[in-house]
Amino acid sequence: TVMLYGQLEVPEGITERQKMRARAKRNRQRARTRILALSVMGVELVSTLVCFGLYFTGTGVSNYPKGTTYTASVIRYMYEREDDNLFFRAETTHSQTLNDGALNGYNGISAFTSSANVRVTEFMRALGYGAKNTYNRYCFEESSPVANLFLGIKYMIERDGKDKSSTYFDEVNRFGVASLLVNTAYLPLGFLTEPELADLDFSAGNGTFQFQNDLFTAATGIDEEVWHKLQGENLAITGNGADITESNSTGYCKYSGCVSGANVTYTYTADRDGFVCVHLNLPKRNDFYVSVNGVELYKETISLPQMIAVGDVKTGDTIDIRVECDKDESSTMTLSAAVLNGERFARGYEILSASRLNLTRFRSTLVEGTVDCDRDGLLYTSVPQNGNWSVKVDGKPAEIRL
């Protein structure tokens, strides 16, 4: 928006009193213009919040970042550990805002920006994160170890005082309620994959476990599913103060007649050991609680379909996802849970980590490095492509295929 301020012309021969009145009139016009501009900005901000369904409560200086000085200490320690590393990414287990990385000075994933690259948005949606190609944002939540492979996530920051260590993240330090976790299956900005990865259509991906199975196979060449779904006899859907009018063994549920305090609970029984994630599609943007064997892990709210991490489980463990419903609410929801095959994942990680991109120079417009290839393949990088990047291999131009 461009605003033009008019210049006041004062005729010759008028009195000083008339000049003062003219200046006062000009100042009133400017004040009205400023008020109008602020009103337009306010309306635009409210419209943005409504249109994009942001579910972040108001954040003031006193409670940002979550964990305050403890979180600042964790971030400082993280960079001390990585003093010789030219680039890596970090994220929080649960977002406080969509621009936590930019606000706290680390390279993150979540973003809310008017210049969001639609291809990156589609890529994030395909990996199971909260994203939509008509929105200008995407949100990282602690999720799938498979997705983390392709994002260069080396660290996660936990800010609620909880123990978030698992098979795939080790706690390396703690300051008060904030802790730093390192990815035990970390892959850097670039690494060698199988050529078939270039044929995978990320724009058609919808964040499901099946897409991640296809992604894992295309990248590693391991033609076995890395995710095993919990469904059929391993799933029970119950309504508490809500009438379940339709459901199936794969996680679809239709409900109505909700009373105050109603909920729909999905109970999964693990039929094997492993790391569990859940994919949720909640059109009503409900609050939900995640519990294992009756112990509540966390509460969350999402505004778009998203995959989230539950954690390590043992055979026979029960995972409850309790979805809260408003009074008189009626809608549908679809949830699915799956257990990661640790042995297959480890084999795939070994293949992908064999030939890594070792950075020698890094700037916002230049990435240089070396790769000691153990085979022919496709060099994958998690550099967001905006049409301005070009690639050279051994000094010769190379095709960007993905």
Predicted features along the sequence, with ranges:
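Conserved luminal/periplasmic juxtamembrane motif of membrane-embedded glycan-processing enzymes
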Residues: 1-240, 286-287, 304-327
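Active-site-proximal, structured, solvent-exposed surfaces of multi-pass membrane proteins
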Residues: 234-402
